[in-house]
Regions:
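Envelope-exposed proteins and targeting segments
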Residues: 33-36, 60, 74, 85, ...
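Conserved P-loop NTPase
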Residues: 76-79, 87-119
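Short, well-structured beta-strand/strand-turn elements
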Residues: 46, 59-72
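Beta-strand-rich C-terminal secretin pore/gate domain
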Residues: 60, 73, 81-82, 109, ...
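Gly/Ser/Thr-rich loop/hinge elements
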Residues: 1-47, 74-79, 95
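C-terminal recognition in membrane/secretory proteostasis and scaffolding
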Residues: 15, 58, 80, 114-141
């Protein structure tokens, strides 16, 4: 998704291993989407969604509305042991283009807007009750 929005060669993320060796991932083509973008996030926004949010925010391609994201920014591998059991290890950590840690920290929104408690655990929130969506619409005008 980042390839469709970011400029060619914009940094999407850094992967850093335990020896602080960095790999950089950059956008590979020119964007095909060139319009204001407002991303909604909450505490359930995790992993690759956080990477996208961080990439768009740091490259000034989107504003983020909602609450802080979950904070899962690591690469994990499952090693199979001789007895058939497994061991999950963390091999690398993701950083945003500005080298901001994601893991156990999350991505902060540009505009913090909490959902009312009455709709927090509802699968489908009516538009009129969705304070985050209402703020995004207001910002888009």
């Amino acid at each position: 998704i980042a390839d469709y929005i970011l400029n060619k060669d914009d940094v999407i993320l850094y992967e850093v291993d335990k020896n602080n060796k960095e790999k950089v991932e950059k956008a590979e083509k020119d964007p095909i989407i060139d319009m204001p973008i407002i991303l909604l996030t909450n505490e359930n926004t995790a992993s690759s969604s956080e990477i996208l949010a961080g990439a768009l925010k740091d490259n000034r391609k989107a504003k983020i509305v909602g609450t802080k994201t979950y904070g899962k920014g690591v690469i994990q591998q499952l090693l199979t042991l001789p007895d058939g059991s497994g061991l999950k290890i963390t091999s690398e950590e993701y950083l945003t283009p500005n080298r901001t840690k994601i893991n156990k920290v999350g991505i902060e929104p540009d505009e913090e807007v909490k959902l009312p408690d009455s709709v927090k655990n509802v699968l489908k929130v009516e538009e009129k009750d969705d304070t985050q969506l209402q703020k995004a619409i207001e910002m888009a005008k």
